[in-house]
Structure formats: C-alpha cells, structure tokens
Regions:
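Active-site loop ensemble at the mouth of alpha/beta enzyme cores that anchors a bound cofactor
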Residues: 235-250
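Glycine/alanine-rich phosphate-binding loops at beta-alpha junctions
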Residues: 226
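Conserved alpha/beta-domain cores
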Residues: 1-209, 215-217, 229-231, 241
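Conserved acetyl-CoA-binding loop of GNAT-fold acetyltransferases
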Residues: 218-222
Length: 250
C-alpha cells in the first residue's frame, strides 16, 4: 500500500491532534521541512492554511541554518514563521538571529548572549524556547532541568529575546509509558516556568510517532515531518554536515 499524499496525511494528523487535545485548545503543528524542497513546503503550507480552523502563521521547522537560508527566498511571499529546531552552534548565531522567528534549541548562556547581540533592533524580539535534556542522554543537547530557572531569567532580561517556553526530545524508547513519563515531567517543568514568567505559553514536544501522546500530556506545539512527507530514505544524506549530537526533530 502506498503512503498517503502529504495532503491526505495532513488531514489525518490534524484529526489525531484534535482528538488528543479533547476540549483543550488545538496545539500548533510545526511542519518539519528538513531535506524537503521549497515547492513541497509551499504546497503543504498552503494546504494547512486552507484547512478550516487553521488561524495564524504556518510554522516551518528547519534543523540547519544554511538549509533555511537556501529555501527562504523561494518561500518569502507565503508569510511563513521560521523555527530553528536543530542544535545551534554559537558561530551560527548571527545568521540564526537574522533569519528565524523562533529558536527552539537554546540551552546555554553563551548562546543566549550571542542571539541577543545579533538580533537587529529593527526586528521584533526573537522567540526562544529552552531545550531540556529531559532523559539526561549523553547523545543529546539541552540543559538540565535544574538549570532552567537561571537560563530563563537570562533570556527574560534581554529585550532582544522573548522567552516563550520549553522544548524537549525524549529518548526514543519503544515503551510508550516511559515516553509518557518524560512528557509528564516536561509538563511539570513548563507549569513551573509559566508561574514565573508571563510570556511563557509554548511547550514544544512530540514528533511524528508520538505527537498524540505528547498532546495528551500537555504539548502546545508538535513537530511533524516524516508522518507528513513520508520517511526519509537511508540514502538521502543531510544537506549539510550533521552535528554528531544534533537532535532529529521530526
């Protein structure tokens, strides 16, 4: 059986998201566009915008700064909201601060300082999520839960940045009960951050294989790529050299 088209897949994803949310507000769908050409992104973005009840910006997630920069000229007229969801090295902060509306992978003070320094005063504040290494994986980036408070205070003190919440990628455990527990821990950390910072409203967690579970546990944004476009094949290399510790946010 062939995989559903992106348009059919989009309908399935939105239905599952709504069912998982129940009577809570519909979470935002972030379209993960890693390795996808600009024309494919445009078609899905237009389909999402056309769906009944889809209000606000269509959000596009990219893992690599260079890949986003290469695609943005062709997509500039669509009013897309660009999110960086891959690990950001400090030497790429200048380009990221200029090109993205959100950076979801802030995990250290040096990066906070660099993004604030390079965000132009003519731009609106850069929306920032703190990436949390919720399962304490050596192979993943992200701050420790106990470091969230200090990092959040640093971000909130900088007018060039806007603290919006938390992001996490739990360990890819086949036991969904353990993933649920990780999502629940993230929800607890998020609720604590909401109580301290009025700007916080976003909990980004859940990907193609577990977005419904993440929504059930309180995600306000899910990052979906392979469930929408189809799985990337093993012979499809990343468009840019991969960080060996880079997160796979699909």
């Amino acid at each position: 059986m062939s995989a559903p088209s992106p348009h059919s897949a989009l309908d399935i994803i939105l239905e599952r998201m709504a069912a998982a949310a129940g009577d809570r507000p519909m979470p935002q769908l972030l379209i993960v566009a890693k390795t996808q050409p600009a024309d494919a992104i445009a078609r899905v973005a237009e389909s999402l915008r056309a769906r009944a009840g889809n209000e606000g910006h269509v959000a596009i997630g990219e893992n690599y700064v260079q890949e986003a920069l290469a695609k943005q000229p062709a997509l500039g007229g669509l009013g897309l909201e660009w999110h960086l969801i891959g690990h950001l090295q400090s030497n790429k902060a200048r380009d990221a601060a200029a090109a993205f509306d959100w950076v979801q992978t802030v995990d250290r003070p040096k990066l906070v300082e660099a993004l604030a320094r390079h965000r132009a005063s003519a731009q609106t504040p850069l929306n920032v999520l703190i990436q949390v290494n919720i399962d304490d994986e050596a192979s993943k980036h992200g701050c420790r839960p106990e470091d969230i408070g200090a990092l959040a205070a640093d971000i909130a003190a900088r007018p060039e940045l806007c603290l919006r919440g938390l992001m996490a990628i739990p360990a890819p455990d086949p036991d969904m009960a353990r993933r649920r527990a990780a999502f629940q821990r993230m929800r607890g950390l998020f609720d604590a951050l909401v109580a301290r910072h009025a700007s916080v409203d976003t909990l980004s967690m859940g990907m193609s294989e577990d977005y419904a579970l993440a929504i059930a546990e309180g995600a306000t944004m899910v990052r979906v790529g392979s469930a929408l476009f189809g799985a990337r094949t093993a012979n499809t290399p990343p468009p840019f050299p991969a960080d060996p510790m880079s997160s796979e946010s699909t």
